[in-house]
Amino acid sequence: MAALRVGTRAVEGRFQASNGGGGGGGGMAPSSRLVAAHREAKPRSSHSAAPWKLPRRRAGAMPLWRVAVFASVALNVATLALLLHHYATSPPPHHHHHDAGLATRSSDAAVHRRARTASSMAPSTGKPAVTTDSVINLDHGDPTMFEEFWRETGDAAEVVIPGWQTMSYFSDVTNVCWFLEPELDRQVRRLHRVVGNAAVDGYHVLVGTGSTQLFMAALYALAPDAAAAAAGEPISVVSTAPYYSSYPAVTDFLRSGLFRWAGDADAFKGDSYIELVCSPNNPDGAIREAVLDPKTGNGRTVHDLAYYWPQYTPITKRASHDIMLFTVSKSTGHAGTRIGWALVKDRAIARKMTKFVELNTIGVSKDSQMRAAKVLAAVSDGYERRPEQTKETMTTPLRLFDFGRRKMVERWSMLRAAAAASGIFSLPEETSGFCNFTKETAATNPAFAWLRCDREDVEDCAGFLRGHKILTRSGAQFGADARYVRVSMLDRDDAFDIFINRLSSLK
């Protein structure tokens, strides 16, 4: 059609030019360029050598340009009629096919958007994969062993947070810990009741960025106020050796005038102190009690129960100390969520600890709290039937503590066999007890191995193992002999298997 119109305009131009400058019929005068072109053109033959003249139109005949215009209009009308006829006689379109196409395209677009979002927000994978020649880093207690369990839970531990949620600083202004999410409070109490490892009735639940922040908050809350500290010595912070290596580092990091690290509790002779009791103990897994009697002096105690869970040790009693610290990193393996909690009896102490977190970080990430609450709920669901469930509707439960204990029993068996095969390493004796949670006798399987190198020419066990591409933490950092090292038992299977093979080959 467009080509036809272009051709018509060309024809019209030629016929208009033939009408002359003032002839009848309303024709337009030819352009000066067209006339000049005809004047300059060479004759095509001897018959056309005479000067070129505009032909005259016959009287009474219809101009040819009008014929061309009429033909063009007729052609357009005919074409339009054919199109209308085709549309009128065609069957109606199937709207459900059209809608399905739109839905498919919309669905595809949504998938692509999600893929782009997932790609742009892909999380880190943590430590790189290892090979038989890799350096195996077991210095940190990175609990990636639990990834295997959580991969099988589907959406049981997933949480979706809309963009408008968790925007306020505040969670519950009526609570002592005003930035604690109510759902995390509920799930913490629920899990402790399910496991039976700590009392929760009559306790304040406080949340922190890991239990380390709450440990610092406890020191702040238990220490004398600034005026009293200025008039005397900072209060001493002690723990029985071997003690957790971060205790002295964290205590003295800011060089506070309120408290200072004073070393082994067994060697302490002062009156004012804060004793840290880690049970099961990091690094050796021993069950600990306070060694200092607060009745004989001005002493307070903080119980670090990060490892008091059924996968590591029998649950022999329901702990009910004044201040108890826990963390999701060792209970469920979610170290990257950075959530810890404290159970605190005294309201005034709870307020001071909350004030420390407020001044330190203005609260704790609500997003992390919501994820931690969902994770803890998934753990409890594995052992506790929900009210809406019946025996018929219950699916096979995914039980974290069963998985954890099975893995730890297997790994400790492998480690003891490797130490025996090498002949130069020794481990603490295995202990056991009746577990109120599993209702059976269970052995202790600590999250860390307290490994000693018995070879006479090795005085630095960490250095010796480093030479064989095994990174551990020296016993010297725990207030103990450098012949000892702490070894994480919580890494992925591939790294742990390589470690076992290397250890068994050392002589």
Swiss-Prot record:
Q: Which function does this protein serve?
A: Probable tryptophan aminotransferase involved in auxin (IAA) biosynthesis. Required for auxin production to initiate multiple change in growth in response to environmental and developmental cues. Functions upstream of YUCCA1 in auxin biosynthesis. Required for polar auxin transport.
> Which residues pair up as cystines?
none
Q: Where does pyridoxal 5'-phosphate bind?
A: Y169, S211, T212, N282, D304, L305, A306, Y307, T327, V328, S329, K330, R338
| Involved pathway(s) | Plant hormone metabolism; auxin biosynthesis
Q: Name one Pfam family in it.
A: Alliinase_C
Q: Which residues carry this modification: N6-(pyridoxal phosphate)lysine?
A: K330
Tell me what this protein is called: Tryptophan aminotransferase-related protein 2
The broad enzyme category this protein falls into is transferase
Q: Which reaction does it catalyse?
A: L-tryptophan + 2-oxoglutarate = indole-3-pyruvate + L-glutamate
Whichever gene encodes this chain, its name is TAR2
Which cofactor is essential here? pyridoxal 5'-phosphate
Q: Which family does it belong to?
A: Belongs to the alliinase family.
The protein's organism comes out as Oryza sativa subsp. japonica
PANTHER family under this entry? BIFUNCTIONAL ASPARTATE AMINOTRANSFERASE AND GLUTAMATE/ASPARTATE-PREPHENATE AMINOTRANSFERASE-RELATED, TRYPTOPHAN AMINOTRANSFERASE-RELATED PROTEIN 2
Knockout-associated phenotype = Strong dwarf phenotype and pleiotropic developmental defects affecting all organs. Reduced endogenous levels of auxin.
Enzyme Commission identifier(s): 2.6.1.27
Gene Ontology biological process terms, A to Z = amino acid metabolic process; auxin biosynthetic process
Tissue specificity, per the record, is:
Widely expressed.
**GO molecular function annotations of the record:** carbon-sulfur lyase activity; L-tryptophan:2-oxoglutarate aminotransferase activity; transaminase activity
Q: Region annotation Disordered: residue ranges?
A: 91-135
Keywords in alphabetical order: Aminotransferase, Auxin biosynthesis, Pyridoxal phosphate, Transferase
**Which segments cross the bilayer?**
none
